[in-house]
From Swiss-Prot:
Protein family: Belongs to the MraZ family.
Pfam annotation, one family: MraZ
Organism of this sequence: Paraburkholderia xenovorans (strain LB400)
GO biological process, one term: negative regulation of DNA-templated transcription initiation
Domain called SpoVT-AbrB: residue spans: 5-51, 77-120
Molecular function, one GO term: DNA-binding transcription factor activity
InterPro entries, sorted: MraZ, MraZ_C, MraZ_dom, MraZ_N, MraZ_sf, SpoVT-AbrB_dom, SpoVT-AbrB_sf
PROSITE patterns: SPOVT_ABRB
Alphabetized SUPFAM superfamilies for the sequence: AbrB/MazE/MraZ-like
GO cellular component, one term: nucleoid
Protein name (record): Transcriptional regulator MraZ
Keywords from the named record: Cytoplasm, DNA-binding, Repeat, Transcription, Transcription regulation
PANTHER family tied to this protein: TRANSCRIPTIONAL REGULATOR MRAZ
Subunit structure comment from the entry: Forms oligomers.
Underlying gene: mraZ
Amino acid sequence: MFQGASALTLDAKGRMSIPSRYRDALQTQAEGRVTITRHPDGCLLLFPRPEWEIFRDKVDKLPMNATWWKRIFLGNAMDVDMDGAGRVLVSPELRTAGGLAKEVTLLGMGRHFELWDAQTYTAKEQAAMAEGMPDALKDFTF
């Protein structure tokens, strides 16, 4: 399970260093192979390949009225291999789709990651905190 936030920088070629705390798990779980695609909230999703295959199968089974979401998730998906230095290349198309500049935030979200432009993530997080807890969390105990 992946968790935690990491402040990272994309290099001039659009490569991102995977934090060392995740590298071993990605090597073991997916042989360093990941898939990156778009997320409806404006960030990117980064899946270890076995988790992507599960997600892809679920998306593929969506009904016809969700065809555009199939296009968004599957049509934008790119398979990437982690290089020897533990970096993954985020394609120019996906960087544009995710609004990624140089500074990014990688969030561990359990079985996958979200990749955000750092400023966008901070703004959205602050807005969510200002709104208060949603009803679904009202009975949640810390």
